[in-house]
Amino acid sequence: MTVGIVEEKSVTFDTELRLESGRILGPITLAYETYGELNAARSNAILVAHAWTGNAHLAGRYSENEQKPGWWNEIVGPGKLLDTDRYFIICANVIGSCFGSTGPASINPKTGKKYNLSFPVITVRDMVRAQQLLIDHLGIDRLFSVMGGSMGGMQALEWATQFPERIASAIVLATTPRPSAQAISLNAVARWAIFNDPTWKKGEYRKNPKDGLALARGIGHITFLSDESMTAKFGRRFSARDGQFDFFGRFEVERYLSYNGYNFVDRFDANSFLYLAKALDLYDVAWGYESLEEAFAQVAAPIQFFAFSSDWLYPPAQTEEMVTTLEKLGKPVEYHLITSAYGHDAFLLEHETFTPMVRAFLEKVKTAAK
């Protein structure tokens, strides 16, 4: 079963948020969706945090005519992993994004114009502090769990270290304690693609800089896949539409990247892409601490980690560093390495594999809370 027709909600907070940079952002609007019902004890809420270019549309459809359901529709609904007959599921669009929450494309109330590059640099920790405003607004003192993959996993880690008293558990998939130099360099090249598009106009564009953003998305998309998955899907097949010896003839993988890149332009804002890429690069769960050990000493709730064998963006060794650190500290931690050909995107695609493990973990958390 599915959650059916859903609606996007939003709330605006008049309070100003002091960011990690020291700058102030406010008022803040957050777009979000909820599924299921909050129980009388307000103890069954699970926050699902989205990745870089995701949004609050986690599951269901806005109308019968919507072509695709929410981005993790397979795990949300009656009888599914995130069972809406048991849990109250929340997903909020992060600040800095472009799907209804305050970001660079929003109107700055002080000027009446779009923020564009006057928008402050934000961090994953800032995103979580904004989420905390929403959780307070919903009247929830303590989340049963926070779950997310990639940048969503970073948010879950921030909840576990910055607000340990407010979560009963965390589920972290395909993430890292800090992006590597290689990951940062790939984001840098993606940024250059946008910067060097003359229609970007230093962020003051009226229409999305389509060529730069499409190229940036193509670079990013490669990092989400694996050699194995790309070989299986495309191999070295040349496009049937192009002549093999045409100068501009393309392999199927080239056509795929172009198609996805230019489709992306229609749904995502270039400045938001840049700001969230910066937030990813700046991420370090140990920011403000002397070490990872000191950061993880704050953890109180059990954390379940998943890594995927072919993920070369945030490889398993980076998850294992976190698991080992938590184990040394005597913290409750569980780790699963899943063999998968899907690369970094495996956290979205291997739900049938990890569902029984997550379900068992949540049952243990529930039993321990009794």
Swiss-Prot record:
Its predominant location is cytoplasm
- The main enzyme category here is transferase
Complexes and interactors: Homodimer.
Q: Which residues form a coiled coil?
A: none
Q: What is its EC number?
A: 2.3.1.31
**Do you know which InterPro entries this protein is assigned to?**
AB_hydrolase_1, AB_hydrolase_fold, HAT_MetX-like
Single GO cellular component term: cytoplasm
What Pfam families does this protein map onto? Answer: Abhydrolase_1 (PF00561)
Q: Name one GO biological process term.
A: methionine biosynthetic process
Q: Report the HAMAP family cross-referenced here.
A: MetX_acyltransf
Active-site positions, per UniProt?
S150, D311, H344
The keyword Cytoplasm is assigned to this record: yes
**Native source organism of the sequence:** Geotalea uraniireducens (strain Rf4)
What GO terms are given for molecular function? homoserine O-acetyltransferase activity
Role summary:
Transfers an acetyl group from acetyl-CoA to L-homoserine, forming acetyl-L-homoserine.
Question: What is the official name of this protein in its record?
Answer: Homoserine O-acetyltransferase
Pathway, according to UniProt? Amino-acid biosynthesis; L-methionine biosynthesis via de novo pathway; O-acetyl-L-homoserine from L-homoserine: step 1/1
Quote the record's binding site residues for substrate: R217, D345
Per UniProt, subcellular location reads as: Cytoplasm
Presence of the UniProt keyword Cytoplasm in the record: yes
Keywords from UniProt, A to Z, are: Acyltransferase, Amino-acid biosynthesis, Cytoplasm, Methionine biosynthesis, Transferase
This enzyme catalyses: L-homoserine + acetyl-CoA = O-acetyl-L-homoserine + CoA
Q: What are the AB hydrolase-1 domain coordinates in residue numbering?
A: 44-350
